[in-house]
Structures are given as structure tokens and as C-alpha cells.
Amino acid sequence: MQLSKGLIDNPIKMGLLLEFNIAFPGEEPRTVEEYLKGGSREIILNVAAFLLGFKNHDSKYADNKELLKIFFGPTNNDFANELFKRINSLEKEGNRVGIIHPYSSLTLFEYFFKRPAEAQTQTDAEFEVNFLKAYLVLNSEYTAKQQKASDSTKDLVRDLAFPMLMFCMNYPVSDKQHYDINEIWITQVIKAKLLFEFLETQERTAVLYKAFLDFFEVKDWQEYLKSFLPLTLSMMKNENESHTDFHVPEGESFERACAFLDKLIVEDQEDLNEYDFLTLRSKPFYKVKDGVYRIIFNLFVVEKIFKGMYFFLREINDNLPEAQQVKALKSLVGDFFSEQVVLYDTIQTIFPDKCIKFSGQEIVQKGISGGPDYYVRKNHDIMVFESKDFLIPADAKMSFDFARYEDEFEKKLYFEVRDGKEKHVGVMQLIAFIRKLLTKDFSADTNYHYRDVSIFPIILVHDHQYNVPGFNTLINYWFQAELETLKEEGLYTAKVKPLVTINIDSLIYHQVGLRDSIPLNLVLGKFAEHIKKRTHLKFRDEDEMKAYVLSRQVAFSTFLNEYFKDQGLTKKPPIVELIAPTLFKDEQQ
């Protein structure tokens, strides 16, 4: 089975974001506040939520003509036509021009949500023009921030310079642009079920689990999900590209349902966290009126199913009496649960039989030190998994600065110097274990010849924000440097494949296909071939060279999606069979 040449399409597209000075050359921009002074706060929030309701791919409003139609009424028809001509002339030069961007829409919402309403003095025609100008000022603000990406990568070695430029330019907002909402919903629900079952059965989380139920006034986690999931489904079923309102049905449960939703809304004039929209992630609804709640951003609502649970739990845990608090909650959820529940469950699902496999816990029980989080050998392919559930600080994420990214990722995935000593993680853990494999020092599995097996080093991450072109390039660059030390030791490294970072959600989503149709080791082999550096290639110009390099930066999760799509083997997890028996257990009894 082979992929068609050029099939794997990179989600990061080369194009222009429409800025103020491009749309209005020669005009001095004013501030967002100045443009929208005298505008209706209610309308501004409504429009911001409307723009955030656009599809992140295949949107009809990707057509700028269609977009400008909804921005301007008949009075501003000439203005809109002139603007469209300017955009059209840019696109004829080969530049794809975009206007709407999640950074600008979210920033606009945050800015005006925390401001009090003021008297409306602008006419509708004035507001239409001024709103667009304010929005383009925010676009310009975003592209100005991207300059840091260029400045911080210009002196990197050749193999990293362009990949890291693209990574740094896109990483801060890629998770809010390049995603499949259906895939995220399914994987969030599956992981939420695992988390609740974990909390429910662990003695050390008993008090926290009960406090969570009390906070939401529900009897068990099943009732919580049955209250929360319909909020996400209302948005998933909305075929219109606009904001989604959730109307609480009138009846005897009206007050109770509103009380539940009131715990998920951002409050008027609330102090909003300035980095990565953390407050809106935590509270992705706002109240329009009694019984009517508006979704601010669809993605943030879906991520509340599981990803946002940790922040709920942390806040509730912090408010418990100190003696009842779960100690090291972050480690419990981010390390123990992510590895020994999510990772173990996923590997056991996609490799049910016909292979040799050991969990990290089983390796320890065999008295073997220095083992990986999971070991799988299928025929002549060895897969070595290290699980790393982490988020970097929000201000670092939004920095566009390679030096900050390198520092944060190095600590999480390579090594960290503490008290003059190196603490090895990720890459270094994999290198140490590969040394064991190549010297036949892993006693749990020795029935192979080291020259006959291919070794696939894998770092599993637990968030889709790392599905960014260039991320894997950096981590594999570190890995290849360390692999040279094994080669210098005289070890046979020719069949050690490039390191691959994999978002575990992609394995959860494709669990059926990986189990029944194409095993992970075969897809990893295809991916290794795809990203392989090829020398002596000739390009017509620099743009063609950059397009080629960019195509090799694709995240494994994107590659996996396209691979199954190309083979016609995409099969969603049986979500009803996985969730319904426990979610509706009371009704079945």
C-alpha cells in the first residue's frame, strides 16, 4: 500500500492575513477602542461570537466576497467593492488572503467583554466600517508578534531554520485553527470516561470526587456528563456558521439547569487572563439572558469535556481543607493517570494480540530498571513509548520565541539541569533504552537479532497543540544528535528510525483501524519514509524548496489521518458501545 505522491497536505498554508496597512494603505490606524467607541457592546460581542462560529476548514466565508457581504449593508456597498478589489489584486499575485483569525476574534471578545456598556453613538454604516478597521488592527497586532519568530530563528543551523520559523509563527494559535472538532469530541469523551472511572475508584481521590459532584449538584459522574454533553451536541448539530445559543427548556428543572450552566459562564467585567485566552477556555459560555447561554468558541466547549476537567479539579481541590486535599494532583492526573490508564488502555486496544508487549509497570515488576512506559514488538518492529503529558506556560506559548520554546521543550522532552546535574527525560530515556536493546540487555525480550529489527522511538504527548509542523523536527533533531553517541560506541544504529512525537488522541481516534486494518508499526514505517531527508534534489525556485521542506514537517497525527483516508479505512471508535453502558447504567437496571 502506497500513498499517492504529494497526498499528505500540510495544514499550515502559505498566505497573507489581511492587515490594516494592506487594506488601507496610507491611512494611519487608530486603536481598537477608538474605532469602536460609541458602538454597541452587545453587538460587538455578538459579532465576535458569530465569527468564532465559522468552520475552521471548508468555511463558506473563506470566500472573501461572501464574508464582506455579511460585514456591510447597502450603504457601504462602494466601500466593500473597493476593499474586495484590493484583496483580489493581492490574490492575483499568488497570495491567498485571509481576513478572519481566531486570535483577533478571541481578543476582540475578551477586550469588550470586560468593558462596561456605553451609549451607542455610531450609525450602522459607521459601525460597519469601524468594526472592520478595528478587526484589521488586531490582525496587524498578531502579525507584528510573529516577527519574533523570524528574529529568533534567523541564526539557527540550516536544517532547523525554516522548519522552526514555521513552527514559531504558527504554534501559538495552531491548536485554535487546525483541528477536527468531531475527532476532538470523540477523544475527549473517551478520556473523560476513563478519568471519572479513575477518580471514582481511587481511595486517594474519594474526597475530591465527592466535592466535584457536590459542586455541580449531581449524584455521580454519569449525571454530570448527561448534563454537560448536550451543551456540546447543540453546537455540533448547528449546521449554520454562526454562534450557538443553548436555550434551557422551561419546566420544573429550569432553575437547576441554569444553576449548572452558571458555573460555566464568564462573568461581566471579569478579570480575564491575558495569555492564550485561559479564562475563556475555563468558562466558554456567556449569559445572554435568563435561560439563554451563548457559546463563545466551539473548541473551548468541547475541550471542557476532558481537558478542562483538570482545572475544575484543581480549583475544587485547592478549596478543600488542607488535610483533605489530594497531594500532587498534577502529577496524579498528568503522570500516573495519563500513563497507567490512558496509555495502557490505548496500547492494549490497538495491539490486542499477536505481539510481545510490556507496560512500564510490568517491566518494573520484572526487576528491570530503565524501561520505557510501554514496549511493543510486532514481528521485526520494536516500538518504544515514552508518555509525556505536559503543557508549557501560557505566556511562553504565546511568545513566538524559539529560545523560549527550546527551553521549555528541552526541560520536558530532553533534559534539565538541576543542582548541577542533568535530569534525563524523553529523548535521553529513549536513547538509554535503545542502548539496552542494541546490546541485548533487555531481558524481557531477547529472541531477536539486533540487526534484523527496526526500532521506532516514540514520545506520546497528550494535547493536540503539538500537532504543529516543525515540532517533531526539533525533537528528532535532538534525538539524532544523541543517536550519534551510540554509533560512536560501535552500536548498530542503521535500523533505528527517526523519533516520532504522537498525539495519543490520534491513536484513540483511529483505534479500530490500527487494530483491525493497518497496525501502527506499518504506518510508522511509511511516516519515516515520508519525512526522510533527501539530498541532491533540485528546485525551480526558493518557494518550491520551501513548499517541499514544509511538506516534510507534517505532524504524525495529520499523516495518520490522511493515510487512513487514502486507504478508505477511516473508522471512528464505537462511541456508543464504549460510553452508553456506563453512562446510562441506571436506565438499564
Question: Where does each model-flagged region fall?
Answer:
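Long amphipathic alpha-helical coiled-coil/heptad-repeat bundle
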Residues: 1-233
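Interfaces and regulatory segments of ATP-dependent nucleotide/adenylate/phosphodiester-chemistry enzymes
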Residues: 143-349, 477-589
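C-terminal amphipathic "assembly/sorting" segment characterized by alternating charged
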Residues: 52-133, 138-139, 145, 381, ...
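Intrinsic-disorder/low-complexity loop/linker signature
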Residues: 1, 10, 14-15, 21, ...
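Residue-identity detector for glycine
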Residues: 6, 15, 26, 38-39, ...
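Catalytic core segments in nucleotide and nucleic-acid processing enzymes
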Residues: 321-539
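Hydrophobic transmembrane signal anchors and adjacent membrane-proximal interface regions, especially
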Residues: 3, 16-22, 184, 311, ...
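Polar low-complexity intrinsically disordered regions
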Residues: 1-20, 24, 243, 379-380, ...
